[in-house]
């Protein structure tokens, strides 16, 4: 297709990088890969402080996966109906809620509900990313614009576990770290 982006033009990668919208949305797009990777990378520590069995906790992963798949399928219709610009400010809220529930909760039910909310944001993220870039930057140079955002997200996945690991090494409480991640996701939502 030959869809135009903002200002009725096809944006180059250089033009996209120099435009404020690119930098305004990169934080909300980075949050799910950074936080999800950090969360799952540190699940042994989480299960230890919550006094959960690692096997029982991982048995709850289908709730994450199922919600992610369900939300991915539904988000296409939602984005078509309301538009990416209306959904983007809200798509990190389920992740925030999931992190909040897991931070304060101590039961497997809390873990199950929290994982479902994390999966909801993951499902939304998969569809929102594919919709946002062509809508805002056009399709002619979509590969080069998306490759920049994707490589930034891949880099972000390496930062999450490293930052959380350092915070834990410095003696910070993991529940407080999860709460901080919740707050950062909410801030990124409204940015």
Label the model's feature ranges.
Residues 14-75:
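Extracytoplasmic gate region of multi-pass secondary transporters
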Residues 67-71, 121, 152-156:
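MFS transmembrane alpha-helix packing/gate-lining sites
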Residues 71-83, 168-169:
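Helix-to-loop junctions at the C-terminal end of transmembrane segments
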Residues 86-100:
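Structural signature of the two symmetry-related core transmembrane helices
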Residues 109-117:
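Paired small-residue
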Residues 124-137:
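Intracellular juxtamembrane helix-capping segments at the cytosolic ends
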Residues 139-171:
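A late C-terminal transmembrane helix in Major Facilitator Superfamily
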Residues 166-184:
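A membrane-interface helix-boundary motif in multi-pass transporters
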């Amino acid at each position: 297709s030959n869809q135009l982006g903002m200002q009725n033009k096809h944006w180059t990668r250089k033009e996209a990088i120099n435009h404020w919208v690119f930098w305004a949305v990169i934080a909300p797009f980075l949050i799910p890969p950074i936080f999800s990777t950090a969360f799952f990378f540190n699940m042994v520590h989480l299960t230890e402080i919550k006094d959960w069995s690692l096997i029982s906790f991982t048995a709850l992963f289908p709730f994450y996966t199922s919600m992610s798949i369900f939300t991915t399928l539904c988000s296409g219709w939602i984005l078509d109906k309301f538009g990416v610009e209306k959904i983007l400010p809200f798509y990190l809220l389920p992740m925030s809620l999931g992190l909040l529930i897991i931070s304060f909760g101590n039961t497997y039910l809390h873990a199950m509900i929290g994982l479902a909310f994390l999966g909801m944001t993951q499902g939304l993220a998969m569809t929102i990313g594919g919709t946002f870039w062509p809508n805002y930057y056009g399709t002619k140079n979509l590969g080069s614009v998306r490759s920049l955002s994707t490589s930034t997200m891949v880099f972000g996945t390496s930062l999450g576990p490293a930052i959380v690991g350092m915070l834990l090494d410095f003696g910070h409480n993991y529940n407080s770290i999860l709460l901080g991640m919740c707050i950062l996701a909410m801030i990124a939502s409204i940015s």
